[in-house]
Swiss-Prot record:
The keyword Methyltransferase does not apply. GO terms for cellular component: mitochondrial membrane; proton-transporting ATP synthase complex. This is ATP synthase protein 8. It is a single-pass membrane protein. Its main location: mitochondrion. It holds the Pfam family ATP-synt_8. The gene is MT-ATP8. It is found in: Mitochondrion membrane. Residues 39-55 have a biased composition (Low complexity). Residues 34-55 are annotated as: Disordered. Belongs to the ATPase protein 8 family. It comes from Strongylocentrotus purpuratus (Purple sea urchin).
Length: 55
């Protein structure tokens, strides 16, 4: 029955692409865009220096 195989191919194709698009949209929405006027507090780096003492 080629019609049934083609129907399952269409179903699997649509399910795979729907899941791929959902995963991509979730990944893109999980990272909020940083606007130019807003500084992200999670990406701040505390720069410190160390004074080495030579023996």
């Amino acid at each position: 029955m080629p019609q049934l195989e083609f129907a399952w191919w269409i179903v699997n194709f649509s399910l795979i692409w729907a899941s791929v698009l959902i995963v991509i949209s979730l990944l893109l929405n999980s990272f909020p865009p940083n606007s130019a006027g807003q500084s992200s507090s999670s990406l701040t780096l505390n720069k410190t220096t160390t004074n080495w003492q030579w023996l």
